[in-house]
Amino acid sequence: MKTSNLIISLLVISPVTLSAQEQKIEGIVYDDNGNVVEFANVVQVDSCMHFVTGTTTSPKGTFSLPIQRKKNTGYLITSYVGMSSDTISLAKTFQQPLHIILKNKSTEIGEVVVKGKRSLFKNENDIITANVQNTILAKAGSLDNLMNQIPFVSGGGGEYNIFGRGGAVVYLNNSKVYDANILKTINSDRIKKVQVITNPGSRYSSDVKAVIKIFTVDNPDGLGGNAYTSITKGRKFSNNEGASVVYNSGKWQLTGGIGHANYKTQEYTEDRTSVISEPNLLYTNNTTLDYDMTFLDGNLGITYQPSARQTIGFNTRITKYEHNHTIDDAIINHYTDGVNDFHTDGVNKSKNVPIQWLTNTFYTLSLGKTRLDFTDDILVGTQSRKLFYGEQNDVEVSTKNKSHYLMNSFVADINTPITTKVSLNYGGEFTYSRYKQTFDFDENNIETEMKNAENKNEQILGAAYANLNTQIGKFSMNAGLRYEYASWQYFVGNMKQKSQSRDYNDLFPSLNISYHPNDVSNISLGYRQTVRRPNYGELNDNIEYQSRYYYVQGNSKLDYSYTNSINMLASYKNLRLIGSLDFVNDDIAMKRSLLGESKDIVLSQATNISNYKRWNVGVNWWQHFGIYTPYLEIGLGGQTFSYTYMDTPYHFNHPYVNFKVHNTFELKNDFSITLFVDYYGKNYSLFREVTEQWNTQLSLSKNIKSWFFELSVNNVLCPRSRTSTTRCDWINDASYSNRDNRNVFLLVSYSFNYKQKRHQANTKSNEIRRF
């Protein structure tokens, strides 16, 4: 009850006091192409042009300015660098909200156009901003190509990592992205800017390590859309296609889209699991793995903006996947002291079908200088997983795992400027989650250790937070504190398991201090504490059969893992430096051990492990040389982690080195060529060692009016092989893969008057990531 009162109190406190003599002017600022202009200056001056009061436009181009209404009220002046100012006499009457259009100064010079190289990246406090629109980055082609050209960002398929920080939560036009396939509909020429937040404040959930915000190009009213298709030829063909439309009319915006994909790959693998004992035991499994995934997605959204002060809307999205893994020619061998004492051919097939329905409703309101943002997310989903394993002599095992889940999350986010250099951000979250699963199996001519099971997880999460932002001279500071209460209950059947159920009361502080001595340099130091909560699929004790000598098990007693991070980000002109030091407590990993009294069956089980430290440091540099833009990045890192292997401490501390060499040639007629070379050195992740990896990409892209084409050749000269080795207890578990990483990729997209001017979707809960 105390927790609920605390959260409610923080939500209702909103200092909204207005002077009786003040009135407000509201409006939206556009450029002469119909794009909204953010951070434009809007000021009131008196008749002698003396400053009275002022503000800047929001990322949506809107402003709300309290003004002093007197007999001679002066003027309202709107300005932005590179654009002609707009002046309105406040003595006249006018209709609100104002629609102010600022003209680019270049349009006033007749046919003389001066084109310069715009800075690609800018550091501001703990944020790296990539200016994409009207720069060479707009010709990167696919979103993956673009993201891998942003300092310290890597990844693909809509999932991206920040060097030294880990996986980033991605937002598209302020809407959190839960399905990476959504990002495959976007090309670089549709993106306005990208922000990389390297030290998120307390307004973000405690399990968020980094944030990437992607903003698309804005346009005025009308109907527009985008359609795309792509094919990939590796060992097999894959295809991806979709379309989206948006209609803006005055105060209304309607959006919709549909997407479909079919990805197919083929990989050759060999697993070698050794039990180091007397006698020495070895299990090998050689396979040809065929992967086939089908994806279908549909979405619809409506936004209504009755005034510049408030917006209401909802978005709903349904996604369905079907994952099929097929191993038709598994060759299984067992050796005792080098003697092959068991051999069989096997078949392994798995099918995973998750379906999700996510609906987001949001409402934003400005009261005086205070902005209130309310969102509610409802997630309903099911998942069916089936596994069939067969050997010679009619040995068969089949398992079925079905899950149903529900989540409802309400988030309130409030921003109040206290002075021109001090602001307060505060709010809270209340989330209810339920995850129920059943597990059953059949076996023929073999006895396993599995059992039928039914279990359920329920969680109530309450959070309250506050962030104080202030600027003193060339210094700026963001200090925040987040309180989270989580009550988690675990049931077997309908019986609550008290030993596994538990409550958490946690405080998560954050701090970021930045120094900005001039326009070309910036340094930022920060601290943040984060938590890793186990996925609901891990929070059970079900034993699942993988093969005759290999089982996998969850763990209902998993605890939260906490990390304290010290982060640094600095820049000087086109040179950037990033660093971090993490103190990790009770991390979650898949530990290997023998199953029960068995001497040769290996169990891989989720568990909390001992504390350790991670460190990372990276440097990035880029520069324009005419049509050529090189981009160089190098990163170093490691961990201080030890674990028992063969009854002695084994140190997994070998440092790693990564580097990127990216080359872009910007040619005439909207034609560009890019050549990427990436290297990821041998590295450790806890007690798992992964060998080095090379990636290359040669891409050609071209815009022809509303059409965009990209042709890429990937990893042609790179080795396919990669090895992963886990050393734990008396077990050496190695996996060798011959990957399907060499391919040719073709993308074709068409945009017709594409518009999306409001970007109001505000899905915020991070609990969805646990399902």
Regions found by a protein language model. Name each.
Residues 30, 43-45, 79-83, 95-136, ...:
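Short, acidic, small-residue-rich periplasmic hinge/interaction motif at the N-terminus
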Residues 297-323, 346-492, 516-519, 575-579, ...:
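Face-selective signature of the C-terminal outer-membrane beta-barrel domain
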Residues 407-411, 553-555, 559, 565, ...:
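Outer membrane beta-barrel strand-and-loop segments of large Gram-negative receptors
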Residues 382, 436, 485-490, 515, ...:
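Surface-exposed extracellular loop regions of Gram-negative outer-membrane beta-barrel proteins
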Residues 48-62:
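Short, acidic Ser/Thr/Gly-rich low-complexity loop/linker segments typical of extracellular
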Residues 97-101, 111, 143-146, 180-181, ...:
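N-terminal periplasmic accessory domains that precede
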Residues 149, 176-201:
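Short acidic/polar hinge/loop motifs at secondary-structure boundaries
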Residues 350, 453-459, 499-502, 531-585, ...:
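Outer-membrane beta-barrel signature, preferentially recognizing the C-terminal barrel domain
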